[in-house]
Design a protein with these regions (language model features):
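A broad, low-specificity signal for short, low-complexity segments enriched in glycine/proline
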Residues: 39-46, 73-75, 108-114
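N-terminal beta1-alpha1 ligand-phosphate binding loop
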Residues: 21, 36-54
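FMN-binding flavodoxin-like domain, especially the glycine-rich phosphate-binding loop
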Residues: 25-35, 50, 57-62, 66, ...
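Short acidic low-complexity segments
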Residues: 65-75
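N-terminal export signals
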Residues: 5-26
Length: 200
């Protein structure tokens, strides 16, 4: 292959990847559905990203999955699930800002809420659901507490953390761990679909 042809092919490949990344960055391509579903998440280290994808899988893959950092336009979606990772009792500032800015457009479309947290590696209970979802995420979304909701245990992966957070946790001798369970996320996705069908 001539050098000029090789360079042309290389530039075309890079261009194609750039276009596809801009048009659907971090969008998960699922199965088709007569209704448009989306899962929106905010994450620091990837735990909520994995939870969001697994929740969509539990819904038989009918939901697109969006990272709030992409500032997605969800106006074309009929049903939305919202969740995020917790630090100091709250989801990320970016997710909070997005929900406040889009509250009126999203409120009537939200079908489920979830958070991912460390909870000192202890199983979450009603106290965490009340504190992190009912009294925080549900308020940000301006929705009732009757929606499907779930608190998942998360993980610590130092290689995915910003330097300040990593140093702080390492200062407490916090080990890396992974308590996020795919099966729990799949089950929650199935619950969302079931509850939505029953409520029709």
């Amino acid at each position: 292959m001539k050098k000029r042809e090789f360079l042309k092919l290389g530039l075309l490949s890079v261009g194609a990847m750039t276009i596809s990344n801009k048009s659907g960055a971090l969008e998960y391509y699922p199965n088709k559905s007569d209704k448009k579903w989306a899962v929106l998440y905010g994450t620091w280290c990837g735990s909520s990203r994995d939870a969001a994808v697994w929740i969509s899988e539990g819904m038989d893959g009918i939901a697109n999955v969006f990272d709030v950092r992409e500032d997605p336009d969800l106006s074309g979606y009929d049903h939305i699930v919202v969740g995020g990772s917790i630090r100091a009792g709250k989801v990320s500032d970016l997710l909070q800002e997005y929900l406040k800015k889009n509250r009126d457009r999203l409120r009537d479309k939200i079908r489920g809420l979830f958070v991912v947290c460390g909870n000192r590696m202890q199983p979450p209970g009603p106290e965490q659901v009340t504190g992190l979802i009912d009294n925080h995420l549900a308020i940000l979304c301006d929705v009732s507490n009757e929606l499907p909701k779930k608190v998942f245990l998360g993980r610590i992966t130092y290689g995915l953390m910003d330097e300040d957070s990593r140093k702080m946790l390492q200062g407490f001798n916090m080990p890396e761990y992974d308590n996020l369970k795919r099966e729990d996320c799949l089950t929650f996705g199935k619950e969302i679909i079931y509850r939505n069908m029953v409520s029709k």
